[in-house]
Amino acid sequence: MSKVRWKAVRPLRHRDYRLLWIGLAVALLGSGLWLVALAWQVIELGGGPVQLSVVTTAYSIGLVVCVLFGGIAADRLSQRTVIVAADTVRGAVLLVVAALALTGWLEIWHLAAGAVIIGAGEAFLIPAYTALVPRLLPADELLAANGLEGTLRPLAQQATGPALGGVAIAALSPGVAILVAALTYLFSAACVLAMHVRPEPAAPAKADDDAPTGVRSMIADLREGWTYVRQTRWLLASLLFGTIFVLLILGPLEVLLPFAVRDQLGGDAREFGLILAAFGIGGAAGALLISSRKLPRRYLTVMTLMWGIGSAPFVLLGIAEDLWLMAAGAAVVGATGSAAMVIWGTLLQRRVPDHLRGRISSLDFFVSLLLMPVSMALAGPAGSLFGVTAVFAVAGIGPVIVCLFVVWLGRMPSDEIAHPLDQDEGATNLISAEA
């Protein structure tokens, strides 16, 4: 058992990766703090679901608009420099927001403006982080590194960070929580600055004079990736489901959940933080459970049904009047969603050709984000017009219906039988990839 545990944390023996991982852990705590502080700061300013919807939509717009540029920057610049710049900008913006909050000058539009920049910073950071990790670790430790991050993200960003944010807000104020979040981003930047990694040499230019360059080259690459998606039925169906899934659940989760906690439970930031913590703990448990087992034989069907049917407890979030019942529903959604993501990541690694994997991953991220602003923008008005209970009912029932349609549309049962994945390889196992 001790050997198994050692393999799971083996990437942390590398100094540069350890610094990057510590910085990520602290920054994710800050993101969790910011998530709770943002919601309660809007409420303290007298805002409701519509105002919170405006602010969260601003964040998603910054993310969506900049994500493709972030990918280009990660390929053309030093990833270390991009990460440091993104974290420094995010920290500086939150320092300004915290100062405005603590001095009583903060307004809703300040939060919206800050959210746009926070989203843009994240759009640059994520692809740079993804591109940097393989330069820090040997290939046989990348799977374990992904497992470490997959466990860390829900525990820090969705569990510990929100819980700490709820306590800080209840004891002090949202402004103090925002200040702490700002410091976490600056700490992360300092960790990455302390790394010794050097930029890779630039790739030699192609001799083919007819090869597209600049913007034409980027368009050609994106077109090739999109052509592959259109011709790969299971992949196209999965991306279609992901787009609708985000539209149905993200707005209610990000915009309406704080008001469900306040109105149904009579709760405050502490209860809200506990519900988000339940999402995170469930997510970590789901990721660990699915990654410690062999890939399911019906991997496409299992993945899609976990996303769809696993969202049914969203109905509970709109009707529960007991904290633990709401937390249990959140934990189930978190567990099934994270487990499905582990399978999805494995499929991108094993069924997408090597020369297309980066572009397909980028398209996946972009398509997943595409309707995020729409979901955020609609959630507040829909909650005011139809009620929070009705919106959460749609968020719970809608994905169930859509996932059944997508399994049929993508011909997933026949596809997964026609393309079996080696069960002995243990692609989703965090510890068995090394010889």
Residue ranges, per PLM feature:
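Alpha-helical transmembrane-bundle signature of multi-pass membrane transport and export proteins
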Residues: M1-A435
